[in-house]
Amino acid sequence: MSRKIQGGSVVEMQGDEMTRIIWELIKEKLILPYVELDLHSYDLGIENRDATNDQVTKDAAEAIKKYNVGVKCATITPDEKRVEEFKLKQMWKSPNGTIRNILGGTVFREAIICKNIPRLVTGWVKPIIIGRHAYGDQYRATDFVVPGPGKVEITYTPKDGTQKVTYMVHDFEEGGGVAMGMYNQDKSIEDFAHSSFQMALSKGWPLYLSTKNTILKKYDGRFKDIFQEIYDKKYKSQFEAQKICYEHRLIDDMVAQAMKSEGGFIWACKNYDGDVQSDSVAQGYGSLGMMTSVLICPDGKTVEAEAAHGTVTRHYRMYQKGQETSTNPIASIFAWSRGLAHRAKLDNNTELSFFAKALEDVCIETIEAGFMTKDLAACIKGLPNVQRSDYLNTFEFMDKLGENLKAKLAQAKL
């Protein structure tokens, strides 16, 4: 390429540990040599979040709102051990949760499929796209330890000054325990429904919403009712025209049905269910390192793409000791490619769109040609049978991808 592609504005969020190392390599080898970006960078590494009292996370979310495209590296969500390790001021909330709560919308996760990576669930021949409602429930809950005997109650105080309504949660008679209050909002559930129906129509696949409305009759029942109402009013005729269906399923029934299916559907999950099932589905396709994750906001134009896995702490500890690592960068690369593809769509930028697709194609073609990281070699041969010659280390694999991308773009004569 004789000149760089003009890419426009992108918010990038740096992360933690091994994924932070990989993130810099992706920019250095795969993105910045070819694309001129107006990059708005936010360091969401745990130390900087602590130093800014987590303000940097909120600032990043506001920047995504402004520029409509964000790409995020994996980050540490601290627990007690991490608070001690980094001497944190407090146990900061998940940055993903904070960003999602500011932006709203739905997280859609889809497996990246390579022909030579065997699937643990062998019947899955088509992708399953999980739409995770990225707002509220446990992720915005108030939870606490009940120190001793006493009553836990929930009170609703109407703004119009009419009478309060109090519900008894539990009377702790013989000691303490734990309690939690969580919520969701009709508007957010409606946005979730619209995003899910639109995704199903764009893919031409059926849509299933899973809840536990038999137990949470009011809470989960609200999700079921809102989805049904919106489907009947706005989407039923479009679904019928495409010969696809929408159904509500109980979560336990849906999990069983998904295992037996061949894939090829959209699965709309509440926040916690989506968190769990997206990892389960990713592993079923072969690897957690092979999963795209995109937050689509209700305005239809704001998108945040991220890796669907953690910070790969074990590999980072090895890297710190100077030991060889073989860390899979594919999900982090796809965070960039999906973000750039959306930027291209917003700006009607055909060159950037071509680049984003070329980057994804290179990842899949390189793996299918037999060049891969250790986790993927283990999927093929089984971990005990993997020899050193079967895989590339972290840096070798990134170099190989860089070499193949350079060749593909030269061939295209962009």
From Swiss-Prot:
SMART domains: Iso_dh (SM01329)
One MF term in the entry's GO annotations: NADP binding
Site for Critical for catalysis, residues: 139, 212
Modified residues annotated as N6-succinyllysine in this record: 126, 400
Record protein name field: Isocitrate dehydrogenase [NADP] cytoplasmic
Cofactor(s) named in the record: Mg(2+); Mn(2+)
Residue list for modification N6-acetyllysine: 81, 224, 233, 243, 321
Binding residues for NADP(+): 75-77, 82, 260, 310-315, 328
Regulation of its function: Irreversibly inhibited by Cd(2+) concentrations above 50 uM.
Name of encoding gene: Idh1
Binding site for Mn(2+): 252, 275, 279
